[in-house]
């Protein structure tokens, strides 16, 4: 009997200790096995089990890997009226520090990426060499808000976005190089050179990913949806695009051009050829007219001389 009581007491003590050491990761809902270490919440990122510090933003690579793991297992939380959008989403390989590996592969197809995980080369076989992870130094975020009767107040909008980015995503304000409003388009520029970034600074690629998820109503934060209110009016968005500029130009060949770009090039070339043909035909017609006119004048002269 005493043995049973002792075992029960031990279980209660273990449960109490576990409850005391458990914690909640407010900055990343895609984690598991959360525990307190030196009064700081640490968890394991889903899909990789890499430990993350819940007081800072989780790296984009680990977030993408967790999202893919949730998608495969069917556990991904989907927002209301969600449509499937897999553009740009893949299962990445991450370093132990959470950064993207320079070389990413899907089976036997491989490519090189930047620090944002965006492909910057053509796709090759597994023999591809990616010598370094090229840093993304400039991120351009373009958003188009829903139709409004009146334009937004540009000053209020700029102040709100800068305050939100610095407080919610903990990005130093010096990395926000500009906010431009041209109704209905809002453009945010984030710039961060490797020489400017100091230890402890949040990376602009992580900030852009968190912000993009917030705007698209798929927040990474736990129970902390972003409600964008400008002058006490909720702001809705119809479209959002993110562009990445690296410190080294990308290495795409002509083969990688999209069908749309190729079509535009073909149309331009055809227009030039058509213009040249039209010019040649026009000159030929003009030449024939001049010859006919000269012939008539010569005949008139011969008639007068006769």
Swiss-Prot record:
Cytoplasmic compartment residues: 282-306
Membrane protein topology class: Single-pass type I membrane protein
Segments traversing the membrane: 261-281
Annotated Thyroglobulin type-1 domain residues: 58-130
Keywords: Cell membrane, Disulfide bond, Glycoprotein, Membrane, Repeat, Signal, Transmembrane, Transmembrane helix
Compartments, record wording: Lateral cell membrane
GO MF entries: cadherin binding involved in cell-cell adhesion
Chief location category: membrane
Record's GO cellular component terms: bicellular tight junction; lateral plasma membrane
Top-level taxonomic group: Eukaryota
InterPro entries: EPCAM-Trop-2_C, EPCAM/Trop-2, EpCAM_N, Thyroglobulin_1, Thyroglobulin_1_sf
Signal peptide from the UniProt entry: 1-19
Positions annotated with a glycan in the UniProt record: 106, 193
Cysteine pairings via disulfide bonds: 61-94, 105-110, 112-130
Extracellular side: 20-260
PANTHER family from the UniProt entry: EPITHELIAL CELL ADHESION MOLECULE, TUMOR-ASSOCIATED CALCIUM SIGNAL TRANSDUCER
Family (UniProt): Belongs to the EPCAM family.
Name this polypeptide is given: Epithelial cell adhesion molecule
Originating organism: Gallus gallus
Gene name of the encoded protein: EPCAM
